[in-house]
Regions:
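A structural feature that tracks compact, well-ordered secondary-structure segments
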Residues: 10, 22-25, 132-133, 143-163
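The feature marks the first
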Residues: 1-25, 32, 45
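N-terminal alpha-helical segment
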Residues: 19, 36, 121, 138-141, ...
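Hydrophobic/aromatic-rich structural module bridging two neighboring secondary-structure elements via a short loop
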Residues: 22-60
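Conserved small/polar residues in nucleotide/adenosyl-binding loops
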Residues: 168-169
Length: 170
């Protein structure tokens, strides 16, 4: 897990020059290709698609380069179950969010813009957190690292630090 922090932070910052070596170190330490793909895919929910896509391209380039050098990196596992759809996805995402936060999430912002709450529940906590080839502790560690590099994300950083504390103490 220690290699997830620099990879996540550098990818969120868009620091490709330093991301390559961090990815190399992670692979050398046994982090699987699919674990890194999960972290860098999850990145888009926090830092946007451009940074996620650029980081994934950097990983792909590195894996191909290493393959050319005869290094066979562990691909790791894929998700073991299909992601729910429709109402089942909303239900799963809401349950995941509630478990991570420690209580149901609501409030004035979600009353004002209910679509954002639905997107969080169905997509972030549904589609992404239902993928079981990266554990929740690693996902939250990655999220905290990502948010810590982003200006103006203090409220979200605090929220995810609280979620991490709940995960690591339960």
């Amino acid at each position: 897990q220690q290699h997830i922090v620099p990879v996540s932070a550098l990818a969120a910052a868009g620091d490709m020059a330093r991301l390559g070596p961090a990815l190399q170190e992670a692979l050398n330490a046994g982090v699987t290709v699919n674990e890194l793909k999960e972290v860098l895919t999850q990145l888009y929910a926090y830092a946007g698609f451009p940074r996620s896509l650029n980081a994934l391209a950097e990983l792909m380039k590195l894996v191909e380069q290493r393959r050319g050098q005869g290094i066979d990196d562990d691909e790791g596992r894929l998700p073991s179950r299909p992601i729910p759809t429709g109402d089942a996805l909303l239900k799963a995402g809401t349950a995941n969010q509630t478990r991570l936060v420690g209580a149901p999430v609501g409030g004035a912002l979600f009353d004002f813009a209910p679509a954002v709450g639905t997107y969080l529940q169905t997509h972030l906590f549904g589609d992404i957190f239902e993928r079981d080839n990266l554990d929740w502790k690693s996902r939250e560690l990655a999220t905290v690292a990502m948010l810590s590099t982003m200006a103006g994300a203090q409220a979200q950083l605090q929220s995810h630090m609280n979620m991490s504390c709940l995960l690591y103490t339960s």
